[in-house]
Amino acid sequence: MSGGCGSMYKIEIVSPEFKGKSMINQHRKVNQILKSVIPSLHGLTLVTKSDE
């Protein structure tokens, strides 16, 4: 997913770890894991859900 800049990403994650967690808490978990690479990205779209 890029508007020509090459650094816009869409990440879709399905995990049982997300069960019972709000979307904001799911995204916080992913952001914590990706914190070292996020500054180099122009844009990031997260889609997270549990495997229910």
Curated annotation (Swiss-Prot):
- Which Gene3D superfamilies does this one have? BolA-like
Show the disulfide pairing.
none
Instruction: Tell me the superkingdom of the source.
Output: Eukaryota
Which InterPro entries does the UniProt entry name for this protein? BolA (IPR002634), BolA-like_sf (IPR036065), Mt_Fe-S_assembly_factor (IPR052275)
Of which family is this protein a member? Belongs to the BolA/IbaG family.
Instruction: List the protein's name.
Output: BolA-like protein DDB_G0274439
Native source organism of the sequence: Dictyostelium discoideum (Social amoeba)
